[in-house]
């Protein structure tokens, strides 16, 4: 619903609604519809210059000489929009992604944090991680356990291996995304075949065909860079990375996980370099993921707190004991660290939320917020709203006030809601009689935003009257 609303708002040029959807509802700015079009494309096509500038400033991608960039330029309704696309720095530079997980994977590839093997391709070094390559590619998993086993440096001198194409292949393995100059596409296809990456090969062939059709039908366009990007709901990357979490679980917590279908390839070695001990359970993990995703674990493992590590035993990795967390809750943290996802029941979400806050994991906090949003009803909405305020979960807080607006005529009779309004009023520093109350303002906003027909106007007025009557009865005028 939010995604379709975003596309409709971009076609209409409703900057306020788009800002609300991106900043309050966490809708992805580069989402695509069934016609492979982005919000930025519709804003350009419909001539909404202010909205185009806002989208670019908030991470919309429009790199020069790519399919998306050329499509936006060609479809732009006015010269000012075309100039904005050409002049804006994000047209020529990769934009900052809103997604914490994508940011992390890109940094992991570019910086080689805690890498354990270096590939040297015709003199160019690539610092990579055995665990990532093995989880993403059966070919690399096999080679790293046989021909390249135990090697910290792997030198590739074959004349058909292009270092530019090899770098693009690594980008795909780490991020699910690939950017390659059209002159190197054939080299990339050759590597994809060699590494048995059939999905990538299929995506490359389909993208080449689409770009060829676009260039042939749009005179004056020039696509120099081919971009492969998975659709938003594509689970392949996260499922592959979750394999590392499967392998990190201690035997006593695996349960039915290791029954058929067997999640780990036979003999797959994830090459863990850190062991977390939680209430007697040992989780064999990777510093690259924990340090890269959490400042808490970076301080624990990398900085001056490294004395917390216990020496390795019997050839295993060094161990760190974690306190104040149960194995079940840490399992949720584990899967989030590797795959950016974990199955959370609303009941478990409270415990995980507290730990996510302690471990400085805002993305996991958002997952907890989504789970808690599923349990909203008249009895729970005020309590969940308080939790959202406490842990600064803006989207969940907005969902709570949106739900409150729907049932406000019943909520005004509940003591917990009345107390929440009084506390909000008291929290406004030096509040004057006519100062607004944030909770009340948010409810009013959602009541008003639902009005689209004449019949809805009367219903909205009834809800607002119920709220105003409550405010008068408790001596608040705002």
Curated annotation (Swiss-Prot):
Expression tissues: Ubiquitously expressed in all fetal tissues examined including heart, brain, liver, and kidney. Also expressed at lower levels in both adult heart and hypertrophic heart.
Q: Which UniProt keywords apply?
A: ANK repeat, Coiled coil, Cytoplasm, Elongation factor, Protein biosynthesis, Repeat
Q: Which domain of life is it from?
A: Eukaryota
InterPro entries, alphabetized: ABTB1, Ankyrin_rpt, Ankyrin_rpt-contain_sf, BTB/POZ_dom, SKP1/BTB/POZ_sf
Q: Where are the ANK repeats?
A: 1-31, 35-64
This chain's function reads: May act as a mediator of the PTEN growth-suppressive signaling pathway. May play a role in developmental processes.
- According to UniProt, the name of this protein is Ankyrin repeat and BTB/POZ domain-containing protein 1
- Origin organism is Homo sapiens
Task: Please name the gene that encodes this protein.
Answer: ABTB1
């Amino acid at each position: 619903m939010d995604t379709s609303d975003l596309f409709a708002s971009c076609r209409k040029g409703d900057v306020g609604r788009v800002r609300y959807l991106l900043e309050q509802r966490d809708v992805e700015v580069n989402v695509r519809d069934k016609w492979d079009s982005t919000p930025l494309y519709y804003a350009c096509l419909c001539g909404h210059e202010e909205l185009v500038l806002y989208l670019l400033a908030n991470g919309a991608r429009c790199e020069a000489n790519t399919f998306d960039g050329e499509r936006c330029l060609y479809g732009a309704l006015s010269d000012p929009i075309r100039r904005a696309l050409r002049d804006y720095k994000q047209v020529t530079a990769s934009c900052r992604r809103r997604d914490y997980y994508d940011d992390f994977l890109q940094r992991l590839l570019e910086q080689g944090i805690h890498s354990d093997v270096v590939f040297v391709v015709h003199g160019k070094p690539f610092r990579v991680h055995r665990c990532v390559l093995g989880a993403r590619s059966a070919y690399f998993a096999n080679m790293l356990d046989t021909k390249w086993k135990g090697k910290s440096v792997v030198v590739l001198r074959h004349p058909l291996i292009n270092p530019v194409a090899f770098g693009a292949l690594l980008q795909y393995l780490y991020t699910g995304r690939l950017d390659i100059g059209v002159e190197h596409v054939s080299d990339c296809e050759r590597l994809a075949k060699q590494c048995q990456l059939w999905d990538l090969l299929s995506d490359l062939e389909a993208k080449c065909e689409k770009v060829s059709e676009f260039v042939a039908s749009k005179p004056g366009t020039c696509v120099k860079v081919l971009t492969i990007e998975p659709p938003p709901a594509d689970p392949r990357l996260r499922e592959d990375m979750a394999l590392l979490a499967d392998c990190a679980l201690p035997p006593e917590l695996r349960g039915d996980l290791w029954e058929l279908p067997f999640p780990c390839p036979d003999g797959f070695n994830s090459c863990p370099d850190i062991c977390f001990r939680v209430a007697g359970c040992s989780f064999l993990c990777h510093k690259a993921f924990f340090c890269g995703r959490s400042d808490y674990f970076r301080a624990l493992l990398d900085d001056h707190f490294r004395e917390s590590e216990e020496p390795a035993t019997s050839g295993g990795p060094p161990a760190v004991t974690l306190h104040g967390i149960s194995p079940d809750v840490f399992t949720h943290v584990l899967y989030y660290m590797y795959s950016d996802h974990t199955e959370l029941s609303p009941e478990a979400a409270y415990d995980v939320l507290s730990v996510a806050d302690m471990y400085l994991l805002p993305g996991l906090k958002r997952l907890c917020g989504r789970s808690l949003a599923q349990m909203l009803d008249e009895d729970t909405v005020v309590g969940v709203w308080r939790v959202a305020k406490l842990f600064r979960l803006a989207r969940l807080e907005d969902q709570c006030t949106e739900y409150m607006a729907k049932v406000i005529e019943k909520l005004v009779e509940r003591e917990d809601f009345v107390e929440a309004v009084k506390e909000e009023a008291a929290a406004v520093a030096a509040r004057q009689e006519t100062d607004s109350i944030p909770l009340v303002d948010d409810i009013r906003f959602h009541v008003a935003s639902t009005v689209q027909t004449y019949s809805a106007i009367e219903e909205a007025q009834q809800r607002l009257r119920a709220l105003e009557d409550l405010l008068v009865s408790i001596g608040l005028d705002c």
